[in-house]
């Protein structure tokens, strides 16, 4: 964590992450590595809040995912970046660019991690990977409005309020 004027940046990385299936019932998250760099606007004020008050303090705030990377050990990599904000009711808004490599393997890993979205994730990533070509990166924009996530006109799912 580092201070940037009134803002706060959070950054870190970890490899060989294993998610305990007991905390993700019905989901299998493959072994992965991850890194992140996230900026929270007016974060100094928010981190000074009592822990129980932080969720409420985040409402109405803006931030930026500068970079968040997940690399699955069995193949597939996703990077996300873009501005995000929470409205006064805790619903997320954002325009996130998702860039990925090895879309087929990434689609398989994400389908196991998010089985309720598998029917959308696997074909979308496979099609984008096919369009990009072998060993190339592909990108798509995820639009999030009031917690509703879509890729273009295709609805992906919902993110509950904080």
Positions of PLM-derived features:
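Glycine-rich, small/hydroxylated-residue low-complexity segments
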Residues: 1-162
């Amino acid at each position: 964590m580092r201070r940037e004027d009134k803002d706060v940046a959070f950054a870190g990385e970890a490899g060989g992450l294993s998610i305990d299936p007991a905390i993700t019932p019905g989901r299998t998250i493959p072994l992965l590595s991850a890194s992140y760099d996230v900026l929270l606007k007016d974060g100094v004020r928010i981190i000074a809040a009592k822990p129980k008050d932080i969720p409420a303090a985040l409402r109405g705030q803006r931030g930026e995912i500068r970079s968040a990377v997940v690399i699955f050990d069995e193949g597939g990599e996703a990077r996300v970046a873009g501005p995000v904000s929470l409205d006064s009711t805790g619903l997320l808004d954002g325009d996130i660019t998702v860039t990925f490599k090895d879309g087929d393997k990434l689609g398989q890993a994400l389908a196991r991690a998010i089985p309720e979205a598998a029917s959308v994730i696997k074909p979308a990533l496979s099609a984008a990977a096919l369009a990009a070509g072998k060993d190339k990166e592909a990108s798509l924009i995820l639009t999030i409005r009031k917690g509703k996530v879509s890729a273009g006109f295709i609805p992906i799912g919902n993110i509950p309020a904080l």
